[in-house]
Curated annotation (Swiss-Prot):
CDD domains assigned to the protein according to its UniProt record, in alphabetical order: EPSP_synthase
Residues noted as binding phosphoenolpyruvate in the record, renumbered to the chain: 20, 89, 118, 166, 342, 384
Active site annotation, chain numbering: 311 (proton acceptor)
HAMAP family found in the cross-reference section: EPSP_synth
GO MF term set: 3-phosphoshikimate 1-carboxyvinyltransferase activity
Metabolic or biological pathway, per its Swiss-Prot or TrEMBL entry: Metabolic intermediate biosynthesis; chorismate biosynthesis
Subunit description: Monomer.
UniProt-recorded name of the protein: 3-phosphoshikimate 1-carboxyvinyltransferase
Similarity section: Belongs to the EPSP synthase family.
NCBIfam families with a match to the protein in the record: aroA
EC number, as in UniProt: 2.5.1.19
Length: 429
């Protein structure tokens, strides 16, 4: 667990960790490309290593080093054992689709307790539309999942756009194997679109083209058939989701910090954290590849639509605790479908510290109190809650004890060390 105490000042230069979203998609794309690919600056986090493990099970040769991964991709093979993807929902969803293209037999995909609670039925239903047989072993729409090898026999699939963009990413990465051109048709308005923009961006670098469909009565994506993934050398950019904790720390504390490896023109939706803190009153400096912050700033509450930025909700919740007036988070129903119900967890745990938070069906209303008190907090082994609650603890009176700190290895393995390097008063016990 983490012991967090009030921190008076933070100062220094800190690199944002590599992007989890980009690393997942790049290692899987490289594994599907026939030949040698090099991934520079990959995220050596547990979730991305789960994707690398799954790709090995499906035939890729992967060497993981700290600063680069070497991948020799080849044709998919039948896995010789169950594919255990640990705690990685992204891996589960993408590999479920991809594994349908093994030459014969079956693939079985499962993970830890948390993964075996994550919804999969919308993806299984979509694969069925394409002629692919896949099912939950317990007939309850969650892992373990069994996928049968099979050709794609339909050129159109309909799926909701408001549950998980990972389902759509899985289809995007699988449909290039089809013999014919295909369409993904969205039956509801799309949420988390920036994650699909990341998918399209990565696939483009590996030679796979996807077009967006925007018509009066149809929204979705068009994927040409018989496409081949091509090997390449690819550099992973920094992760704005993880950088949000560094940025919020600088905004709320007496600070002089520079966050490097975050790009002004990134396709990541979570780059919105810059605009959010600016609208709240923080005069941060954004450059081509870094953000400079000299806090603290006097913040004011604002209304924030989190349709496309679900991973920022825990960070926003903490910022709202120290803003004047009300901070309203809305359009966040899908935030309940992450590693845990993050809306409920933020409301319950921050309230223990004295925060004034009202939970709504699609979001939160946070009334700034400017004062929190240390408490013992549960995180449901959710990495984003651990990091957000750490910020709250540094601004609270007394001592804050945060359970489940091991989960940060998923997206920000050296979170504690980097935070301590700029002066944060935190310890692992």
């Amino acid at each position: 667990m983490l012991i967090v105490k009030r921190t008076s000042e933070v100062k220094g230069i800190i690199n944002a960790p590599p992007s989890k979203s980009y690393t997942h998609r790049a290692v899987i794309s490289a594994s599907l490309a026939n030949g040698l690919s090099i991934l520079k600056n990959p995220l050596n986090g547990a979730d991305c290593l789960s994707s690398a493990h799954a790709c090995r099970m499906l035939g890729a040769e992967i060497t993981n080093e700290v600063e680069k991964w070497t991948i020799i991709g080849s044709k998919l093979k039948v896995p010789d054992n169950i594919i255990d993807i640990g705690n990685s929902g992204t891996t589960l969803r993408i590999i479920t689709g991809i594994s349908s293209q093994i030459p014969d037999g079956y693939a079985v995909i499962t993970g830890d307790d948390s993964i075996r609670k994550r919804p999969m039925q919308p993806l299984l239903d979509a694969l069925k539309q394409l002629g692919i047989e896949s099912f939950s072993t317990r007939n309850n729409g969650i892992a373990p999942i069994i996928v049968k090898a099979g050709k794609i026999t339909s050129n159109s699939v309909k799926i909701r756009g408001d549950m998980s963009s990972q389902f759509i990413t899985s289809l995007m990465m699988t449909l290039p194997f089809s013999e014919t051109d295909s369409e993904i048709i969205l039956t509801t308005p799309l949420k988390s679109e920036p994650y699909l923009n990341i998918t399209i961006d990565v696939l483009d670098k590996f030679g796979v083209k996807i077009e967006k469909i925007v018509e009066e009565n149809k929204t979705g994506y068009k994927i040409k058939g018989k496409q081949s993934y091509r090997p390449c050398e690819y550099t992973i950019e920094g992760d704005y989701s993880s950088a949000s904790y560094l940025i919020a720390t600088g905004v709320l504390l007496n600070s002089d910090i520079e966050v490097k490896n975050v790009f002004k023109n990134s396709k990541q939706g979570d780059r919105e954290i810059i605009e959010i803190v600016k609208k709240m009153g923080a005069d941060v400096e954004i450059n081509e590849n870094n953000v400079k912050i000299k806090g603290p700033y006097n913040l004011k509450g604002i209304e924030i639509d989190v349709t496309n930025i679900p991973d920022l909700v825990p960070t926003i919740a903490v910022l709202g605790c120290f803003a004047e007036g009300k901070t309203v988070v809305y359009n966040g129903e899908h935030v309940r479908l992450k590693e845990c119900d993050r809306l409920n967890a933020c409301a319950v745990e921050l309230s223990k510290m004295g925060a004034d938070i009202e939970e709504k069906p699609d979001g939160l209303i946070i009334t700034g109190t400017h004062k929190l008190t240390g408490s013992k907090l549960k995180t449901h082994d959710d990495h984003r809650l651990v990091m957000a609650f750490t910020i709250a603890g540094m601004l609270a009176d007394g001592e804050t004890v945060i359970e489940g700190e091991e989960s940060v290895k998923i997206s920000f393995p050296d979170f504690v060390d980097k935070m301590k390097s700029i002066g944060c008063n935190i310890e692992v016990i």
